[in-house]
Amino acid sequence: MLNYNFYESKSKEHSNQLLVMLHGFISDASTFDKHIEHLAKHTSVLTIELPGHGADQSLDTETWDFAFIQQQLDEVLQTFRKYDITMHGYSMGGRTALYYALHGKIKLEGLILESASPGIQDNASRSERIQVDEARAKVLEIAGIEVFVNDWEKLPLFASQSEMMSEDERQRIREMRLAQNPQRLAKALRDYGTGNMPNLWPELNELSIPVCIIVGERDEKFVNIAEKMEDVIPHCEVHIVSQAGHTVHVEDAKQFDIIVIGFLNKEEQND
């Protein structure tokens, strides 16, 4: 079973709500630490660590594909069935959350996707991305975690972090990345990286639950993806956070919490 941490809501008014939070690649549940205290005033929170990350102990002999992760999430969420569950996922966690919303056994009441894609639509681009994922996996295995993190931090995707985050926060995120196991990260990339994600675009119109998409203004690629998703998801709202890039929850934590709490409150009013 996946590793998780449960934080019970301090609010009797929202005692039936549960927000499940899934982190991104080369990360773990601690990425959400600064949000827990505030969010727990409005909802119970469950942070779950994906295969190969943090304290997860998924067996290396298993294939960590999306069907496997869905089954693992089913097991965890079975314990929390009494709650009205909204699932949030960032980037890799967002792709996982979207897959779960469409294929999981436990019905969700809402879905929050932060900087996430429904997958790659054409085979040529998919093949290219599988090669990129494989190259990154080899860097992790051969060069090690520090070399990989140094390269990862230089990606244009994260350029806005230097302006939007304090030095202390950037250091905290760096230390979290460096604490990951490079061999297990390599397996995660190969098993459920973007290249190996099923194309979920054709299924988006089947989402019957409310969906909230959060993207940073500077993250043009994912702003474009969000707007295309909004066109086909029946009950969808898109929030473009000013000045932020890909990692909205760490670049503008306050605005992220405002959006999430607002979405949860709307869901509760509609029950």
Regions found by a protein language model. Name each.
Residues 46-88, 258:
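Active-site loop/oxyanion-hole signature of alpha/beta-hydrolase fold enzymes
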Residues 124-127, 142-203:
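Conserved alpha/beta-hydrolase catalytic His-Asp/Glu region
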Residues 5-58:
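Conserved HGGG/HGGXW glycine-rich cap/lid loop of the alpha/beta-hydrolase fold
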Residues 244-257:
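Catalytic histidine-centered segment of alpha/beta-hydrolase-like enzymes
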Residues 207, 213-215:
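Short beta-strand/loop motif that positions the catalytic acidic residue
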Residues 89-93, 97:
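Gly/Ala-rich beta-loop-alpha elbow adjacent to hydrolase catalytic centers
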Residues 102, 109-141, 147:
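Flexible "cap/lid" loop of the alpha/beta hydrolase fold
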Residues 220-225:
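Conserved alpha/beta-hydrolase "acid-adjacent" motif
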